[in-house]
Amino acid sequence: MKYLLVILFFFISSFQNNSEVIIDKKEAQDAFALLIDIRNNPDKYHEELNFEKGLKVSKIKLKWNDTLAKIAESKAYDMANRNYMGHVDPDGYGMNYYIKKSGFKLHPKWTTEKSANYFESLAANTYSGVESINVLVTDKDVPSLGHRKHLLGLDSWNAALTDIGIGFSKRESGSTYKTYTCVIIAKHDY
């Protein structure tokens, strides 16, 4: 009987481990490295990522920000854990709220609406952080190309952003998607 209980325990435990949310920092760093390379060499990627050659990408060097990375990791974890995909969490809060809550300085008017998001791009169900960046830069079926503009700094707002953090989470079961990626690009003391 004792052996049967042990076997039953391990059998049940094996299913529970598959629903654990895992933060993968290596995938986040790989995504960051690719984004930097795309921004530095856009013509190298224009065919693969479906944008015109000679695209005027922001020349501002993005700096990894540990605070933004922790927020991005928390968001990727939360989406996997609570099984949603969106810029506003189930409690109605957007990314600007969480950035301000972390101590990262934002203009006060950017946090008056609790669902506001000026700094976040999201991807889901990609096999890697690199694929997440590819999907977001391609921005297929997004007429405004908002993710591309955000990640590559293609307009005056996004071109001024300097700090970046990326979170990549995995969950084998228990959520709609197996992976969630959150990319935050902002500017400290804006």
Identify the role of each PLM range.
Residues 20-106, 160-163, 169:
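Short, well-ordered surface patches within globular domains
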Residues 8-9, 39, 151:
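Hydrophobic, Leu/Ile/Phe/Ala-enriched alpha-helical segments that form helix-helix packing faces
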Residues 94-190:
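A well-ordered secondary-structure block
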Residues 15-19:
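Signal peptide cleavage region of secreted peptide precursors
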Residues 3-13:
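Sec-dependent N-terminal signal peptides
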